Amino acid sequence: MYYFTSDVHLGAGDETFSRRTEQRFVKWLDKVAEDADAIFLVGDIFDFWFEYGRVIPKGFVRVLGKLAELTDRGVKIYFFIGNHDMWCRDYLEKECGVKTFFKPQHMTLAGKEVFIAHGDNMNVGNQPMLRLMNTCFRSRILRKLFSWCVHPDLALKFGQWWSGKSRKSHLKDHITPSSLEFLIDYARDYKRHNTTTDYVVFGHMHYPYDHAEEHLRVLFLSNWDAEVKYAAMDRDGRISLKTF
């Protein structure tokens, strides 16, 4: 089995809410690890993550420990950066054994061709300010300057404030199926250029949705604020959204 989830946003909310989310996520990891060929964490697992050369954010020890435990047991875990945890470096890979991807990936799973991406920074060609902001945030030079010039405490306070603003823009009450159309269009265009693609999996929108059309499925994963919808794909290549 292959499992996909996203937008856990560990660290969001007050301490009680954050701890409860972390505990639920650990239970989910334990559950799916029982028969997982691989687990895909499709971005924004952390509400904010900025990794210095020798410093990582305080907290998340249950999740970090669980990731290390599972990979030590041989479970394959793949981590895709999202717009909230794009400033990862090599900590998760070196310390937790989690393969980290900084770009979308096209993979063959159970005989199916699957394109996996968080979903941010896509179809933004007509949004110059968003394109510029994404370029700045992903700049290695600016990231290095930030780590040299800004104390970790200040960096995390700023990051948590910024992440809170960004997360509120994707409140589920504000999202409808029509809000997903720009990513569905992206998936269609990707399919035109990569004709063997069977499935496209996105996070980011905090709205679970299974869009099917001829020769293409596009699945959107939920966030973890309430009922969780994750994707599961069996060894015959059948994929669907499940509830946790």
Please report, for each region that a protein language model flagged, where it lies by residue:
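Active-site glycine-centered loops adjacent to acidic/histidine catalytic or metal-binding residues
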Residues: 7, 44, 82, 118, ...
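Short coil/turn segments at beta-strand junctions that form active-site/ligand-binding loops
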Residues: 35-37, 75-76, 112-113, 195-198, ...
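Beta-strand-turn-beta hairpins that frame and shape the catalytic cleft
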Residues: 1-3, 107-115, 213-218
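Short, well-ordered, mixed-charge alpha-helical segments that flank or form enzyme active sites
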Residues: 86-90, 116-117, 123-126
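Residue-level marker for buried hydrophobic side chains located in beta-strands
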Residues: 2-4, 39-41, 115, 201
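Conserved beta-sheet core of the metallophosphoesterase superfamily
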Residues: 97-102, 120, 124-132, 137, ...
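Core catalytic region of metal-dependent phosphoesterases/phosphodiesterases
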Residues: 5, 10-109
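Active-site-proximal loop/helix segment associated with metal-binding centers of metalloenzymes
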Residues: 119-183
